[in-house]
Amino acid sequence: MHAVVRNYSGAGAKQLFDLLEQRKGDVEANLRKVPGLVSYMLLRSDDGGMSVTVCKDKAGADESLKVARDWIQKDASNIHANPPVVTEGSVIVEIK
């Protein structure tokens, strides 16, 4: 499995997460199209928030980045949020 964490902070981050919460059904529908999606979480932080996506492989994780980027460009470009800091890697432990 491969995980991607997108951390949004700074200019526009709180507004972006307000919009993501308001449009969570749309966000969920778009991410469910990602091949090999295992899980997705959206978390608020003091200065914005982060998303954690786990996919069966790196190809799915890469597609999740594209889906997120495209959604923000289409539906949240007016917010002008700073780009996320992206961290990704192979999952070594999973607890269910």
For every predicted segment, state its role.
Residues M1-M50, K56-D70, S77-K96:
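Short S/T/G/P-rich N-terminal loop/turn motif that feeds into the first structured element of a domain
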